[in-house]
């Protein structure tokens, strides 16, 4: 069978690491194409001004967000998450893996982001707000100098009701886009893949979102969503595989993180680097954050992606250089994982190419380890995440194993989701982790 110009045996011979990947083993890949940040960033079409523009837009919308989502009032309508020290978890990791990773371990709490409880509240909500603003400005309902809390009026909601928003999702992107679009007054449809969790579908329907379920994976859900949207001139399709707006929405996080690190007195320099571990699905969220981090910290930050052993799409795409032209299914990998947000078989080529000169590396993690770390974190720090969100905790362990850490480094695990998970499902996930721990 031809896979992007070669047969399976030729690919395995050309890239020996693929032999382990197709057996769904945990692997580590160091990116051979990484360049100094200044060179890598200079190659890219997106610039710092694009991210600054996104930040300004989010500030314009802050009065509206504060008025319709009371949980954001304390932050003045900005959608932001805490930066949390997790020293007890660091001790637990050292114990579990017989290591002693030097440096401080922090968790970026995007599991607690208001509105939709995941990293997708950054890019997803931003792109919907940008689209809403362009419609309002084009129709002269609003100017960029106005108080955006005016958007909460019935008249504006009525205006938006003649427009539709469509997205394909494994879960969390659909939640963020569904919630904000419905709140604004848009007609919104989320096409969900077969691995999307039932509670996410239920929550969307409760908020008035139309959910279309597919018996295929993420790529098919996106394809069907795009088809539906293309048939309606008043419909706007949010494309997780190619969206620049999603990407810059995520990148804003890096500029806010800089302030949070300063507040904690944490320096980020080449001698005191920041290692950031980001769970990766199709790539938009971690890619956008990594891009922002490179803009802010340059070579003083090292970004790593974490993928499930059964859904290593970005790893295969970047390793082979074939990006979106190759999928995990091409190699007989089933794309079945409890980390539903990461259950993607084909990566974003846009993100893979953006990351080629910037990303330090990618590692994979098996589902049993995700559940084990989920239970460990709950016990150590009282923080409850969904399985995909703990993938970053495995990063410092992988670095130590290979002697790649620096004694003065700060380790930052990006917790991508969890606060919206129903209590009984979280309890089941936790118990599974406890049971797996006992068996190990």
Swiss-Prot record:
A Pfam family cross-referenced in the UniProt record is PALP
Its required cofactor(s), as named, are: pyridoxal 5'-phosphate
Q: What is its EC number?
A: 4.3.1.18
The biological process GO terms on file are: D-serine catabolic process; isoleucine biosynthetic process
Give one GO term, molecular function aspect: hydro-lyase activity
User: What superkingdom heads the lineage?
Assistant: Bacteria
State the top-level EC class: lyase
The family database entries (SUPFAM superfamilies) matched by this protein are listed as: Tryptophan synthase beta subunit-like PLP-dependent enzymes (SSF53686)
**Which PROSITE patterns does this one have?**
DEHYDRATASE_SER_THR
The alphabetized UniProt keywords are:
Lyase, Pyridoxal phosphate
List the catalytic activities from the record: D-serine = pyruvate + NH4(+)
Q: Which residues carry this modification: N6-(pyridoxal phosphate)lysine?
A: 120
* Family under the similarity heading: Belongs to the serine/threonine dehydratase family. DsdA subfamily.
Q: Which HAMAP family match?
A: D_Ser_dehydrat
> What protein am I looking at?
Probable D-serine dehydratase
Q: Native species of this protein?
A: Shouchella clausii (strain KSM-K16) (Alkalihalobacillus clausii)
Q: List the gene name.
A: dsdA
